[in-house]
């Protein structure tokens, strides 16, 4: 667009001002009251704590994981804590058909959807990579492909509610760590896909926020067991982590960080990347792209 280049500096200044202003907006628990929320990977750990926080805030919650028995306990506790409603649907995110059907069923149970929190994860044993392609494939299926499938299935409802997606990721999706190549690859993929999708939403005026949640080591049973005797860094509390995920998503932040050091967000939250992405978008002929819906497609 010609006007974009003509007023590039002005637009960039407004963009940066909005970016920093939004980061200072205050969270209020009542933001979640009555909201309809899906939480994946919710039978234990961070996902379970997210469900409990949402319940205390008066949200409608549908949780999923593989363990039916564990989910039943989570739902019972959510109702005790004050959830407007709570349901579970058990299944595996290795099954893409289940992932797609789960979203539709959850939407029917709640009568819509305001927030999709993608928290499930497949951990691999910490080891050097020696060509175990099956580990890479499984990591990408569960930690990346299923996130995309769930998001696509949820989009009609989220567009109607102008809702939000939380993509729970890791510092290992921003920088490299030895011994976790398949896991790290899936987390880098989340950043690449969902950050690009966010920019496409902006161009297409789709009012659905995407929050990439960058986590360090959290004191979940699974994470501590996987890293015991190998990784010496501190583990942060899962209860507080879960609350920060909800806050960042409710405030529609592009990224939220919950890591052991307060300096990490400043080191990884790269403003230079934001500026470069903005400048690269100015090189597109958006008039041509947006006027040719048949060729380029659009979210309807």
Curated annotation (Swiss-Prot):
A Pfam family annotated for this UniProt entry: adh_short
Cytoplasmic side: 1-7
Tissue expression remark: Widely expressed in all peripheral tissues, with highest expression in liver, followed by kidney and lung, and very low expression in heart, lung, spleen, stomach, small intestine, colon, skin, skeletal muscle, and ovary.
GO CC annotation: endoplasmic reticulum membrane
Residues holding substrate: 170
Residues forming the catalytic site: 183
GO biological process terms held by the UniProt record: lung development; steroid catabolic process
Gene3D superfamilies hit by this protein: NAD(P)-binding Rossmann-like Domain
Positions that bind NADP(+): 41-67, 92-93, 119-123, 183-187, 218-222
Molecular-function annotations in GO: 7-beta-hydroxysteroid dehydrogenase (NADP+) activity; cortisol dehydrogenase (NAD+) activity; NADP binding; protein homodimerization activity; steroid binding
Membrane topology (UniProt): Single-pass type II membrane protein
Record PANTHER family: 11-BETA-HYDROXYSTEROID DEHYDROGENASE 1 (PTHR44279:SF1), HYDROXYSTEROID (11-BETA) DEHYDROGENASE 1-LIKE B-RELATED (PTHR44279)
Protein name as annotated: 11-beta-hydroxysteroid dehydrogenase 1
Organism: Cavia porcellus
Taxonomic lineage: Eukaryota, Metazoa, Chordata, Craniata, Vertebrata
């Amino acid at each position: 667009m010609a006007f974009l280049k003509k007023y590039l500096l002005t637009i960039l200044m407004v963009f940066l001002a909005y970016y920093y202003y939004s980061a200072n907006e205050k969270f209020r628990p009542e933001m979640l009251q009555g909201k309809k929320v899906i939480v994946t990977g919710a039978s234990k750990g961070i996902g379970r704590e997210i469900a409990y926080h949402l319940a205390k805030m008066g949200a409608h919650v549908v949780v999923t994981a593989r363990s039916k028995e564990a989910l039943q306990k989570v739902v019972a506790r959510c109702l005790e804590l004050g959830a407007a409603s709570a349901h579970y649907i058990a299944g595996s995110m290795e099954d893409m058909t289940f992932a797609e059907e789960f979203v539709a069923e959850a939407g029917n149970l709640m009568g819509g959807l305001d927030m999709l929190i993608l928290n499930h994860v497949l951990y691999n044993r910490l080891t050097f990579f020696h060509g175990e392609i099956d580990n890479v494939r499984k990591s990408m299926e569960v930690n990346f492909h299923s996130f995309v499938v769930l998001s696509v299935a949820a989009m009609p409802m989220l567009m109607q509610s102008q809702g939000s997606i939380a993509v729970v990721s890791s510092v290992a999706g921003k920088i490299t760590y030895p011994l976790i190549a398949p896991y790290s690859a899936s987390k880098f993929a989340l950043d690449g896909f969902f950050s690009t999708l966010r920019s496409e939403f902006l161009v297409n005026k789709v009012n659905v926020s995407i929050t990439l949640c960058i986590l360090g080591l959290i004191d979940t049973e699974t994470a501590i067991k996987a890293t015991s005797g190998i990784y010496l860094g501190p583990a942060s509390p899962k209860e507080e982590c879960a609350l920060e995920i909800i806050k960042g998503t409710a405030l529609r932040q592009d990224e939220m960080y919950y890591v052991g050091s307060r300096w990490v967000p400043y080191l990884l939250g790269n403003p230079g990347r934001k500026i470069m992405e903005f400048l690269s978008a100015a090189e597109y002929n958006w008039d041509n792209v947006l006027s040719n819906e048949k060729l380029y497609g659009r979210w309807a």
